[in-house]
Amino acid sequence: ADQFEPTPGNLLNSAVGSVTGGASACLGDEGDIAVDENDMVYYLDTTLEDNWWHKFSDGGTVYESPSTCQRMNTMAADDRPWVAAQGDGIIHYLGNSGASPPECTGDVGRYWYYHSEDGGLTFSQCYAVPGGWSTIASQRHGSYVYIAQEDADTNSGEVVVRISDDYGRGTGLT
């Protein structure tokens, strides 16, 4: 096909949620998308209240999420969430609200990292990632995860790449 075809989603459920007082019911204004090695598509959508997961199987043609979508329950006003996926349902979520969430471990930072190995059903406790503007990527068929970020600790203007060679397990990023 010459054009992108629509896929089933949660638009109807979102409209119902809005009418019944269900807040945003998942539809935000920006987000990020990733595909694991089994062609499961993960979309992370953001709103002022929280982030929402949408999951599609069969190469993106079948909507798998609950009747509306799955709430992240991280931190409000997460601006520019980033997501990467690899293997069989391993998801990496890099959030940004300008401040470290209180539940994060390790150093303080503008960004925080969450890890899931069950397709986004559960996530690890977050780990603060020190530094400036960041984004995340992973190998679909390999074990490496990368976070590229500006060095906000100095005025050098350098970019730092943090690397995990173990699917981002534990803090994993050095």
List each language-model region with its residue ranges:
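C-terminal PAP-associated
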Residues: 1-174
